Each structure stands twice: as structure tokens, then as C-alpha cells.
């Protein structure tokens, strides 16, 4: 029998005691605000920053012809919505005594959340649960993120 002291152990990661950056998906829904609150509280206790990631889906932009006024209007509307959301995110984080970075991406939410988190060096991703029935049937964002296994994932109800 091998004693626990004789079992080889992998070297600990440089920051194995907690996250160095917490990324949180934000879309303005109630569950996303709860996820932001959880992420801010966790990051404050861990002594690390928070990165809020907003992904505007491209569905409505794909229905217009590139280079037209409609494409420009759709992009402008998405950017304006992101700016309003950024202001609310910063105010919410300030209530927790935290400053938060903000990234606006376009595309598939699961793919863009993971890509943004990876690009910024996040080692924890926080999202809210899906509130829409269609997401429960067709596949929720948290479910897709859990299957990708890029980093630890917290799903806040």
C-alpha cells in the first residue's frame, strides 16, 4: 500500500489558490445581473479583477446586405446597446467596490465568451442560467459552455 505522501503530485498551477481574473457573461437579463453580482463578490474576496463580456448576436445583422445603410444601422444599434450596458455594469460593480473591464463582441455567445475570457487570461467564467424555454429545449448557453471544458464555470441561478 502506498501512503498519501508517496503519491506523486502534479506541480501546482502558479495561481492555484484562486482565480487571477473572473470573466462574466452579461446580456442585461436578471440572471446575468445576478451572475455579475456573484462574480464581483467572488473576485473581491479573491483579490482579482472582473471582466464583463457582452456578446451581441449577429442574427439581425446577417439578414441585411453588407455595406448597406441597414448593416451600419444594425451595428450602430448594437454598439449603442453595449455602451448603455457598460455603464450599468460599471455602476453595479462599483456598488461592490469593484472596477470592471468590459468587452463587446459579436457572434455566437458561447464561442465569443470563451474566446474573450481566454484572450484576457481569465481562469473562471461566470454566467446566469437561461430563462427562456427555447434555450432549455435547444440547448442553453451554460450547457454549451460546460461542454467546451475550457475553464471552470459557475452558473448562477
List where the protein language model places each region.
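Short, hinge-like loop/turn segments at secondary-structure boundaries
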Residues: 67-71, 119-121, 143-144
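General small-molecule cofactor/ligand-binding pocket signal
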Residues: 51-53, 101-105, 154-156
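Glycine-rich, Arg-bearing micro-motifs that act as flexible, cationic patches
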Residues: 124-148
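A short acidic, glycine-rich active-site loop
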Residues: 70-84
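Small/aliphatic-rich secondary-structure junction motif
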Residues: 11-67
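Structural beta-alpha unit
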Residues: 1-18, 91-125, 132
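Short glycine/serine/threonine/alanine-rich loop segments
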Residues: 46-49, 98, 122, 151
